[in-house]
């Protein structure tokens, strides 16, 4: 039995290829059935995200295994083998275990240390269990990887610092305001970055969110998801005074929030401080706003410096995380080897017990027929000894005939002779 991990990701393949190798949730069951129908595959898990498609497999060793699996992947997705072959990576046994642990821990992600991948790996594993996963070694590998990912999160700072603009904006807000549960946030725009910001704010239980956008329909979809109020861009001047935090990210070619607008808002707020985070390029907030007392303006460049600092911290944490992965993968492979030995021991013990039972039954039958107990017991002992040492004796003789001193030494040690 061999453990394999093969696939493509953002490092090895462009999005144009990655999107053609994905497995949709609707067809995943069919894909797993097809994969497990391959004669060499004993068990499998398919992980398919926007940045990676990977197969984790328990397989029987055979010639051309690599080619057979790539052929299956290409046939399933109607791809040219040459087109895919140069982008596929391949890990076996300890390397496969280490790879899965790194993936689950966020060490192989586009955004180093991102936590979402662990949920995606868990879902892939859960989907494979619905009548598909057949290899206990593979199941144990995934369970171990989940515990390793948790250990990495607990023992390192891999996920402690913001490394995305959206997350950095929210982190900044949480650093300045002791609790977001008492503040009102005005979000200007409704694009992807603002969507991420809104979700982060919801997770931190912000008191109230207002979304201002050029098109109400797009803003309303996001507002319904996060429980926010929607206003038009033209209403910002009137509502700015209600906001403790303003986070803006639009595609407007001109500033949306001017110095005069903020001055009026501060006057209405009796100079209670306002945090303005402008993550738009071109800028949504006039730079002069930063000169106003009680108006604290941060641009995307300010956030980028925070992100760069935090990324350096994550990279330092990743070194510690890699040490954890190396240790845990080594322990898992030791367990796997022990399991293999346990199976051999069970077979050997079962064989010996069968010999014992057969000879004991014959001895009991002889006793019931009135045979001499002493003779019967001596015969039983002699036959039992011969039967049990027959196979080791043949192995010793074969090693001696072949001049295999190393094998002789191993056999002697195994038999307790040295």
UniProtKB/Swiss-Prot annotation:
EC number(s) given by UniProt: 1.2.1.70
Binding site for substrate: 49-52, 109, 114-116, 120
Associated pathway: Porphyrin-containing compound metabolism; protoporphyrin-IX biosynthesis; 5-aminolevulinate from L-glutamyl-tRNA(Glu): step 1/2
Catalytic machinery residues: 50
Residues that hold NADP(+) according to the record: 189-194
Family matches, as CDD domains: NAD_bind_Glutamyl_tRNA_reduct (cd05213)
Site (Important for activity): 99
Similarity comment text for this entry: Belongs to the glutamyl-tRNA reductase family.
Protein name: Glutamyl-tRNA reductase
Source organism: Enterobacter sp. (strain 638)
